[in-house]
């Protein structure tokens, strides 16, 4: 068994995504956008479209951080908080209020709500008791980048996890029964 992982590059996610969005490297997400619409792809790599992130994607990134990189990495990048509390009601200000927006602007880490963090903790616990997941994640590297040229096109991937014995591990999160069925089906795409 070859356990050499010298081909894996470690860099911040922001650098990886910038290099995709600038058109320097093709990624699976950009390729999917290109398949959907070459015009969309062009607008993305020329900066005509601001990258937007859904709440589900943010939650997934936070889950990946905690599950694959550990609590130290999670705490480095995220803060668990519902936001500032309205002194009149004793409840957090709504996310659409100026008070919340001002507070959010002052944060040096991404904010994860207490409810979302509880969900992420459940995901982590589920992974920790799943025998196959434990085996796959027992040895390896999280969030490594690999770059190569494919048919003359510079490509890159940011792997969730690389296990030298089992290969690439793609952690999927689901928040519904429909999502779980979809995740189960996607296993066959990768195998």
Features from the language model and the residues they span:
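Mg2+/Mn2+-dependent nuclease catalytic core
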Residues: 137-184
């Amino acid at each position: 068994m070859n356990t050499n992982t010298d081909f894996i590059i470690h860099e911040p996610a922001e650098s990886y995504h910038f290099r995709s969005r600038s058109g320097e490297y093709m990624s699976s997400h950009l390729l999917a956008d290109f398949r959907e619409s070459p015009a969309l792809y062009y607008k993305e790599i020329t900066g005509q479209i601001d990258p937007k992130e859904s709440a589900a994607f943010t939650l997934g990134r936070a889950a990946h951080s905690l599950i694959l990189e550990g609590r130290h990495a999670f705490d480095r990048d995220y803060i668990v908080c519902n936001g500032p509390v309205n002194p009149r009601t004793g409840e957090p200000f709504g996310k659409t209020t100026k008070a919340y927006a001002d507070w959010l602007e002052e944060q040096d880490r991404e904010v994860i709500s207490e409810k979302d963090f509880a969900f992420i903790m459940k995901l982590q616990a589920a992974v920790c008791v799943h025998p196959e997941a434990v085996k796959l994640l027992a040895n390896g590297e999280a969030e490594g980048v690999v770059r190569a040229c494919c048919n003359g096109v510079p490509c890159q991937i940011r792997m969730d996890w690389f296990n030298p014995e089992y290969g690439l591990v793609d952690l999927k999160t689901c928040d519904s029964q429909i999502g779980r069925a979809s995740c189960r089906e996607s296993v066959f795409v990768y195998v």
